[in-house]
Curated annotation (Swiss-Prot):
Subcellular location: Cell inner membrane
Source species, domain of life: Bacteria
Gene: yagU
Protein's name in the database: Inner membrane protein YagU
Positions of disulphide bridges: none
One of the GO biological process terms: response to acidic pH
Predominant location category: membrane
Stretches of the chain found on the membrane's Periplasmic side: 1-14, 122-132
Length: 204
């Protein structure tokens, strides 16, 4: 199997792939969120003291929360890497619930990965292996298990509790599976063609 197999250039639809990736990114963000309801990745009793120092500049001492549940990766990324003063500041409220910048980041993160996946799939079809599960596993490995600890967004990999790995692995797999389902269905419906690596007229 040639993992670097490429599609015929005249069958590629980059603009359409990006458009579908935008849709898939928004929808799959809710899938990823939903996966964290029965399998929460972080606990309010696990502390992340290494990332708690800057909180004294944001909140009064009695309001500081050093738990992993509060100091989650999107929060720390916005605070430490983008310099957002308070990532929990409300973007809007709905039915009395606050939607903050951490939630916005979650959706943007999903859109970026979905667009990237859909565009790459136009050229390298093997990225779709196992209906997107390969891409989900790669995202888990390179983002959550390598990049996040190196960026200080999580504790070192071997300090993470087992339930966080279970939640994130499951979440990434169903996230990319949903992206692939949406990508394939919308692309095939809009173009009235199979994916570019499949010859036209094929029964596949």
């Amino acid at each position: 199997m040639n993992i670097f197999e490429q599609t015929p250039p005249n069958r590629r639809r980059y603009g359409l792939a990006a458009f579908i990736g935008l849709i898939a990114g928004v929808v799959s963000a809710f899938v990823k969120w939903g996966a964290e309801v029965p399998l929460p990745p972080r606990s309010p009793v696990d502390m992340f003291n290494a990332a708690c120092g800057p909180e004294s500049l944001i909140r009064a001492a009695g309001q500081i929360d050093c738990s992993r549940n509060f100091l989650n990766p999107p929060y720390i990324f916005l605070r430490d890497w983008l310099g957002l003063t308070d990532p929990n500041a409300a973007v809007y409220t709905f039915a009395g619930h606050v939607f903050n910048w951490v939630g916005v980041t979650h959706i943007i993160f999903s859109i970026v990965f979905a667009v990237g996946y859909c565009v790459v799939a136009e050229v390298f079809p093997k990225i779709k292996l196992w209906q997107g599960l390969l891409a989900g596993a790669l995202a888990q490995l390179f983002v959550h298990m390598i990049s996040f600890p190196l960026m200080g967004l999580t504790p070192p990999l071997f300090d993470l509790p087992w339930y966080e790995n279970v939640s994130e692995i499951f979440g990434h797999l169903v996230w990319f599976w949903s992206i692939e389902i949406i990508r394939r269905d919308l692309r095939n419906r809009i173009t009235h063609e199979p994916d570019p690596e499949i010859p036209l007229g094929s029964n596949r």
